[in-house]
Amino acid sequence: MTVLKMTDLDLQGKRVLIREDLNVPVKDGVVTSDARILASLPTIKLALEKGAAVMVCSHLGRPTEGEFSAENSLKPVADYLSRALGREVPLVADYLGGVEVKAGDIVLFENVRFNKGEKKNADELAQQYAALCDVFVMDAFGTAHRAEGSTHGVAKFAKVAAAGPLLAAELDALGKALGNPAKPMAAIVAGSKVSTKLDVLNSLSQICDQLIVGGGIANTFLAAAGHPVGKSLYEPDLLDTARAIAAKVSVPLPVDVVVAKEFAESAAATVKLIADVADDDMILDIGPQTAAQFAELLKSSRTILWNGPVGVFEFDQFGNGTKVLAQAIADSAAFSIAGGGDTLAAIDKYGVAQQISYISTGGGAFLEFVEGKVLPAVEVLEARAKA
């Protein structure tokens, strides 16, 4: 994968537009999870150190395109960046006609989705973005799977289009985990539905030695193997699909589970052997025996890919399975890569971020890369590098 890298460019005195993924949760005007902002800081600092006039852009939330909405404003992000960088980071709302930024200074552009044509990747808007800069830097892996004005279109028209350090590191890490993984390789794929992760499961079944499933996905595999799942979430129409995947790769199934009679924070948790699951039980986590077995599998792996918590870890009584596996990944000597929104929240909760080799900032983009799909924003950078 050959792309031009920001780290190789002379940015002194250049106007540099950096597309970051600053789509963070905000409550009452305050950023509540800063992982994506923290991930973007090294790129922003490097551009400033290189003497660039830095312009940063991102989307936040899902506003009606072309309309301002206060709840989707990047103002809280500008405030956060100002504190993190120890200097004022002005939020500029009206920038498409041109902006004055001095070398060594930084501004944050207001939400790109307030611009008409952003999501449709309109050439006219992309050309306006491109006219703002000498160098466009795509650093938002989390939106690389979307061909939008600020992720794809601008890269077609900018004088120079390069990958930022965060995007480049992401591509390198994913290439290492998926291109030529050290064996044995284990993957954890969890989520509510097989249907939403079918391509991921199929893709990983071709390169993995162990495919550990969790959540509603595991329930479908359990039902496919003839085990009772009570009133748990599962997909009866995908039992044959689950069997076909299990025929291609080792899919270890839970021997015990944690069940409840209702899905609620106050629900009483009971550990049961899988054969003892009653008709009115909901499976909300893997049991301690299963967690220990899966942890042993991870211990002997040399590559681990983790996407999704294996239980409803937001409720502590259904979090032990995810906690044990998170710790097993942290303790492992394997090259480990983790991605997907809920996965990041679990990593935060159990404090294992420092012990995971690479944490992907992309949710949908991470999954599409794992599926083997071409990411439009990366494809255009490759095309520009060849040209």
From Swiss-Prot:
It is an enzyme of class 2 (transferase). InterPro entries: Phosphoglycerate_kinase, Phosphoglycerate_kinase_CS, Phosphoglycerate_kinase_N, Phosphoglycerate_kinase_sf. Substrate binds at D21, L22, N23, R36, H59, L60, G61, R62, R113, R146. One of its GO terms (biological process) is glycolytic process. One of its GO terms (molecular function) is phosphoglycerate kinase activity. GO terms for cellular component: cytosol. Keywords: ATP-binding, Cytoplasm, Glycolysis, Kinase, Nucleotide-binding, Transferase. The keyword Thylakoid does not apply. SUPFAM superfamilies: Phosphoglycerate kinase (SSF53748). It is found in: Cytoplasm. Its EC number is 2.7.2.3. ATP binds at K197, E314, G340, G341, D342, T343. Pathway: Carbohydrate degradation; glycolysis; pyruvate from D-glyceraldehyde 3-phosphate: step 2/5. It catalyses: (2R)-3-phosphoglycerate + ATP = (2R)-3-phospho-glyceroyl phosphate + ADP. Belongs to the phosphoglycerate kinase family. Monomer. This is Phosphoglycerate kinase. It comes from Pseudomonas fluorescens (strain ATCC BAA-477 / NRRL B-23932 / Pf-5). The gene is pgk.
